[in-house]
Regions:
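Aromatic- and glycine-rich beta-strand/loop motifs that create alpha-glucan
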Residues: 1-24
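Interfacial transmembrane-helix starts/ends
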Residues: 5-6, 13, 94-105
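Membrane-helix interface segments
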Residues: 17, 92-94, 196-201
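Central hydrophobic cores of alpha-helical transmembrane segments
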Residues: 23-26, 198-212
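Transmembrane helix boundary and interhelical loop/hinge segments in multi-pass membrane proteins
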Residues: 72-89
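Membrane-interface capping segments at transmembrane-helix boundaries
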Residues: 266-275
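Single conserved hydrophobic/aromatic residue that forms the stacking wall/gate
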Residues: 275-287
Length: 287
């Protein structure tokens, strides 16, 4: 099973679809990186290490960019081509499913590592030491009040930097978004098990859009959706210490969501028929 996971992981890293990284890097630079570097120049101060990532993953301007990027990379998961049928025969359905779950988790962490690196590299020349938010984030509106309501100049909102340190914010964001990607991947896996891949892909998109849009407008209903719980946006009020959703509740939400999907997957795999799972006319039933 370990060898199979390693082989599939290597294929995931090396496949041609990774060209989307170039488009992601360009978009991040144009929307986030160039703006943050400009802010640092205006304030004559450096950026905190985690600010580029936090702006990329949690800005109201590009709130859905990371989940969309991840869903595109994972859209063909699980990959069941002719060569994989022998693997399922040899491993057994349950071991195959466990391998797919581990593979999805590895890919989720990998995607978040890529997002962090691609978010940080464009601003590397402006990053300085320090554990607190930079003046480019916290004081820009004070010195340039005319830019207060300009979305591009508010990539990191006050409801984030007024309540939590950047390092802690980045850790929570990375962990919750990793769980989000993992959850979306499990839904694709369930869709394949029940031969309803397109339906579950559509459900992923709807959940992503609903949670992201509600978080963008700071509506509390965002926390009924996985994407809303993965975001820092709208989690706090701008003034005061009121929390709309404590982090521990978001971790509980994500954990329950993932556990429920794992239960469905393991129940479904017992009833899985491999007929038509890859190509409708080329496989015989295996039960």
């Amino acid at each position: 099973m370990i060898k199979t996971i390693k082989s599939e992981y290597h294929s995931f890293i090396c496949r041609s679809r990774m060209i989307i990284l170039l488009a992601f890097a360009i978009l991040v630079w144009q929307v986030v990186g160039s703006s943050l570097c400009n802010h640092a120049k205006m304030m004559e101060a450096g950026l905190q290490l985690f600010e580029p990532y936090i702006a990329t993953a949690n800005s109201y301007l590009v709130l859905l960019i990371v989940p969309i990027f991840a869903l595109i990379l994972m859209s063909d998961f699980p990959n069941l081509e002719d060569g994989y049928m022998f693997t399922i025969y040899r491993m057994g359905k349950t071991k195959w499913l466990i391998g797919k779950v581990i593979f999805a988790l590895l890919c989720s962490f990998t995607i978040m590592a890529i997002v962090f690196v691609l978010s940080t590299i464009p601003c590397a020349g402006k990053i300085s030491s320090g554990t607190k938010w930079s003046p480019a984030t916290t004081k820009l509106a004070y010195y340039y009040p005319e830019l207060t309501y300009n979305t591009v100049f508010n990539l990191i909102q006050r409801d984030i930097y007024n309540h939590i340190y950047p390092g802690i914010a980045a850790i929570h964001s990375i962990l919750l978004t990793t769980l989000l990607i993992f959850g979306y991947s499990l839904m694709l896996l369930i869709g394949k098990i029940f031969n309803k891949k397109n339906l579950f892909m559509g459900i992923d998109v709807v959940l992503m859009a609903a949670g992201g849009i509600l978080a963008t407008i700071k509506h509390k209903a965002a926390f009924f959706f996985p994407a809303g719980n993965a975001s820092l946006a709208g989690r706090y009020t701008e003034i005061g210490r009121t929390s709309n959703m404590p982090f521990y509740l978001s971790y509980i939400y994500m954990s329950v969501w993932i556990v429920l999907m794992l239960i469905v997957a393991f129940v479904g795999i017992k009833r899985l028929s491999l007929i038509h799972i890859s190509e409708p006319t080329r496989h015989a039933q295996i039960s």
